[in-house]
Amino acid sequence: HPEVNWQWHHLPLSMHEPAATAGARLAECAGETGGHATFWQAVAWLYAHTRGDGQGLPEGLRYPDLTPAMQGCLDSDRPDAVIRAQAAEAAQQGIAATPALQLRDRESGKTLLLHGPVEGDALLSAIDLLAAGSTTAAEPAHSPDMPAGVAGDMPR
């Protein structure tokens, strides 16, 4: 979608610690030292190799593209400050679980929060809803054919 900038915000959940913060630190340091493409490469690698239920990476497995600059970042407090700030922002916005997508229209300032995994069509519909400048994004229209309880708060 041409009007979209994708931003990742870390939200390590306590049930996935310490692996969640370790992964977030690696991704942050990859981005700090190598830019956006390196950040996303690290995120993809982490998702491909991380075990579920907060177990993290298998014992002895190391990020293959670790550079001295990345190691210097990992040895510092810099990634922790970014992760803490992003987690605090999420808490302030009422986001307490992952995945969550917050869509923000840069022109109008309107936001739409989608909880849980979001299918591609639903994401595109939500983006289109914000891009259309609809004033009813927060209040779905109701008709006699669709009772209020059925509409919910998800974009359709």
Task: Kindly give the residue locations of the regions a language model identified.
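Structural alpha/beta surface segment adjacent to cysteine/selenocysteine redox centers
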Residues: H1-P64, A96, D128, G133, ...
